[in-house]
Amino acid sequence: GGTEGSSHYAWAGFDSMRVLCRAHNDEPEKASRPMSASAGGFVPGSGAGILHVESLESAQARGARIYAEILGGAINCGGHRRGGSMTAPNAEGVQRCIRAAVVDAAIDPDEVDAISGHLTATGADPKEVASWAKALQRSPETFPAITSTKSMIGHALGAAGALESVACVLMLRERFVHPSINCEDVHPEIEKYAGSIPHVVREMPELNTMIKAGFGFGDVNACAIFRRWAD
């Protein structure tokens, strides 16, 4: 799990780096715009999320409601090389992390039904989508549904992975993908994948496997793969 409280002191540093959105101060609900041509930086977020992780035997013994199974995952660092920096990921490192997670989960890339991306509403979004396509070897026609939870709740720091993983297991449980809002004007470099971006709730009866990622800050990457649990 993870928790994040809003701090003017913490976010002032990001504002000084000019990575926060300033164009929608009067309309904050429109400010977080991942994958949008008019994205202008990310929006601070806060909150908390907890996932109780235990063995299948333990969960069944105590009669727990099982939401999903963790198939596998991976973490790595791009080494601050080839475009990687304190605030941006190395695309090759991102792709290695995705592929390593798929291998660890012992699945085929074609089994990924949906992606919960890092997608922060910065200039790195098109590069991230391209990395997903390359790592999963998916064409625009076969590209999974892709969404950004940050479009609705902003970008937390220590809690981002926990919050968005909770969203993943709930989507798997109920078989839907939540919208990536404020993306009416899809970035031109992502346009060929536009059909994979839900603008409203997308019901997906076939949704079984979802991959969640956190990329970027410090050039450190993490991916986890979840599968819906069938009772």
Predicted segments with their positions:
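Conserved beta-strand-centric core segments of catalytic alpha/beta enzyme folds
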Residues: 1-58, 158-231
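Beta-strand segments within the central parallel beta-sheet cores of soluble alpha/beta enzyme folds
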Residues: 1-3, 65-73, 109-117, 143-151, ...
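Conserved beta-ketoacyl condensing-enzyme motif
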Residues: 2-13, 109-129
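Active-site-proximal gating segment of KS-fold condensing enzymes and close homologs
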Residues: 10-23, 124-139
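Gly/Ser/Thr-rich active-site loops/lids in small-molecule metabolic enzymes
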Residues: 22-28, 91-96, 133-144
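Condensing-enzyme catalytic core mediating Claisen C-C bond formation in acyl metabolism
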Residues: 25-107, 113-114, 231
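Short glycine/threonine-rich loop-to-helix capping motif typified by GTGT followed
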Residues: 80-91, 119-137, 156-163, 192-196
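Stable alpha-helical structural segments in soluble proteins, enriched in small hydrophobic residues
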Residues: 97-105, 131, 135, 168-172
